[in-house]
Amino acid sequence: MDVLVSECSARLLQQEEEIKSLTAEIDRLKNCGCLGASPNLEQLQEENLKLKYRLNILRKSLQAERNKPTKNMINIISRLQEVFGHAIKAAYPDLENPPLLVTPSQQAKFGDYQCNSAMGISQMLKTKEQKVNPREIAENITKHLPDNECIEKVEIAGPGFINVHLRKDFVSEQLTSLLVNGVQLPALGENKKVIVDFSSPNIAKEMHVGHLRSTIIGESISRLFEFAGYDVLRLNHVGDWGTQFGMLIAHLQDKFPDYLTVSPPIGDLQVFYKESKKRFDTEEEFKKRAYQCVVLLQGKNPDITKAWKLICDVSRQELNKIYDALDVSLIERGESFYQDRMNDIVKEFEDRGFVQVDDGRKIVFVPGCSIPLTIVKSDGGYTYDTSDLAAIKQRLFEEKADMIIYVVDNGQSVHFQTIFAAAQMIGWYDPKVTRVFHAGFGVVLGEDKKKFKTRSGETVRLMDLLGEGLKRSMDKLKEKERDKVLTAEELNAAQTSVAYGCIKYADLSHNRLNDYIFSFDKMLDDRGNTAAYLLYAFTRIRSIARLANIDEEMLQKAARETKILLDHEKEWKLGRCILRFPEILQKILDDLFLHTLCDYIYELATAFTEFYDSCYCVEKDRQTGKILKVNMWRMLLCEAVAAVMAKGFDILGIKPVQRM
């Protein structure tokens, strides 16, 4: 729906429907008037006039709503889809759901956007035994285009492509609106709740590089949906339950017997875990005690529960160090949260007749899925299947989620598709109403294209990886002698921005479904599509106004008073690129592929460089360096680029700095 009227779309749709019915009623009355003398003729004519008057008022009201200024950025593809949708409906009123294909043009010679609906409509007409050339269809569509604020002209090319050229004044006005009102999307997700399940490490084990992707991708998806106006609940489904806690608690009792009264100095939890695992594997007596501890924990024994909480707290402190460093916020809701709901889940499936017993296990076969779910093990214990079913039900019925996104590696794809199918089978949700989605991702590889490991073959600890990033970032800044021009505070801010920004961007700039090679050398390279290059580009853009002695207040005043000219081809290219931001975000809201945003920011930075090299923003005396003239409309273009880049960085979880 046209974002210009997004806030009143429901009202407009209602008005449009009323217009259609009124038009039909007028036609009916006209026909009645031709039936010859009628005692009601005067009454009918009077009614006809009233209907025409109401119709005229509604049309004016509709146009006024469309022309009403909006503080939100316009999704130009959505606007053009609406315009062409009207034209296609008018040209081919009998076609049901005709294709509506509007895309950005790949080359400037083909205009700014293309409507490629004619070929699809030709195929639809062929099935109705109407043979019409796609080019004729394209001509018919263009004849029916309604008056609108955005199209300058259309051209028909090739077999029936409609090339669309935007009005310069329209683009200029939208850029001005962006500068005056800020980078804003319409409230697409108003009154809608999204749950994003991500990160989800195991308690008592350190986070490793495998958790990095889920954490970074999940946080970025959450930020995007928040920006689009959704109510987002970020959940950390930590592994805080199960057999491993039996051995950890038993080891805690032996190593710190006074743990109930004196807080145990566990120190390195990874070492503590390895010690307990070694004993579990080699000492039969210890193994028995560990199992007893699990039973006592499930029975909510107070001393055992305290030991469990102590271990969780120590682990949580370590996890929070990483979340704080990466600026990630999560609500912890681990497997333990769902323990009391498991019995009801099993009973519900049993009552509905979905449970079969196989070798002591209770299993559920789901139509279309090759592997059954095991909801009760042969020893009577529950499984990941049971807890994931309990979690999805709680999120649907108690949280009342409109959308649930699971950011978990590709290896869990079959598991989640089976969980989703089981939830649909039992009637918990309808996929046409509620979107439940597994946003899978590939593994992190080393430069040898094998799973990323330390030299000794161990999994890379995430804290060590972040520390290495900080070190290399500082080395790079000193290599560029930035330590000689930045204050200590600015240098530290730049170090953190580059280190964490590069790690996040290297991940997010790859298609999440693919494995990606982790290389500090590549991610810290300040050439090409890297965070280092983009962060430098951003600080350069921000410095243009500063070096011209133009402050924020002057820019805001200019935004309200200065028309943005787009006469130079590089100005025009940059202006259009800036305004593509909403359509890029809409695509990602649909498919959750964040590399599209990275590609866009890189494209924007490249378009800016072309513009800056061709168009003087500030004209100086070549001898003295004195500023002779400031081309304010170009300064405003710089500001618009910076505003969109800053919002893009924010969605990606990257913190730019003003000086680098």
UniProtKB/Swiss-Prot annotation:
Keywords: Acetylation, Aminoacyl-tRNA synthetase, ATP-binding, Cytoplasm, Disease variant, Leukodystrophy, Ligase, Nucleotide-binding, Protein biosynthesis
Enzyme class label: ligase
Sites where the protein binds L-arginine: 200-202, 211, 384, 388, 412
Record PTM N-acetylmethionine, positions in chain: 1
Region span, Interaction with tRNA: 529-543
Reactions accelerated catalytically: tRNA(Arg) + L-arginine + ATP = L-arginyl-tRNA(Arg) + AMP + diphosphate
Highest taxon above the source species: Eukaryota
Subcellular location: Cytoplasm; Cytoplasm, Cytosol
Pfam families according to UniProt: Arg_tRNA_synt_N (PF03485), DALR_1 (PF05746), tRNA-synt_1d (PF00750)
GO MF annotations in UniProt: arginine binding; arginine-tRNA ligase activity; ATP binding; cadherin binding; tRNA binding
'HIGH' region, short sequence motif: residues: 201-212
EC number: 6.1.1.19
Region: Could be involved in the assembly of the multisynthetase complex, residue numbers: 1-72
Gene Ontology biological process terms, A to Z: arginyl-tRNA aminoacylation; tRNA aminoacylation for protein translation
GO CC annotation terms, alphabetical: aminoacyl-tRNA synthetase multienzyme complex; cytoplasm; cytosol; extracellular exosome; membrane; nucleolus; nucleoplasm; nucleus
Described purpose of this protein according to its UniProt entry: Forms part of a macromolecular complex that catalyzes the attachment of specific amino acids to cognate tRNAs during protein synthesis. Modulates the secretion of AIMP1 and may be involved in generation of the inflammatory cytokine EMAP2 from AIMP1.
Family: Belongs to the class-I aminoacyl-tRNA synthetase family.
Self-association state and partner proteins as the record states: Interacts (via N-terminus) with AIMP1 (via N-terminus); this stimulates its catalytic activity. Interacts (via N-terminus) with LARS2 (via C-terminus). Monomer. Part of a multisubunit complex that groups tRNA ligases for Arg (RARS1), Asp (DARS1), Gln (QARS1), Ile (IARS1), Leu (LARS1), Lys (KARS1), Met (MARS1) the bifunctional ligase for Glu and Pro (EPRS1) and the auxiliary subunits AIMP1/p43, AIMP2/p38 and EEF1E1/p18. Interacts with QARS1. Part of a complex composed of RARS1, QARS1 and AIMP1.
Matches recorded under NCBIfam families: argS
PANTHER family from the UniProt entry: ARGININE--TRNA LIGASE, CYTOPLASMIC (PTHR11956:SF5), ARGINYL-TRNA SYNTHETASE (PTHR11956)
Record remark: domains: The alpha-helical N-terminus (residues 1-72) mediates interaction with AIMP1 and thereby contributes to the assembly of the multisynthetase complex.
UniProt protein name: Arginine--tRNA ligase, cytoplasmic
Lineage: Eukaryota, Metazoa, Chordata, Craniata, Vertebrata
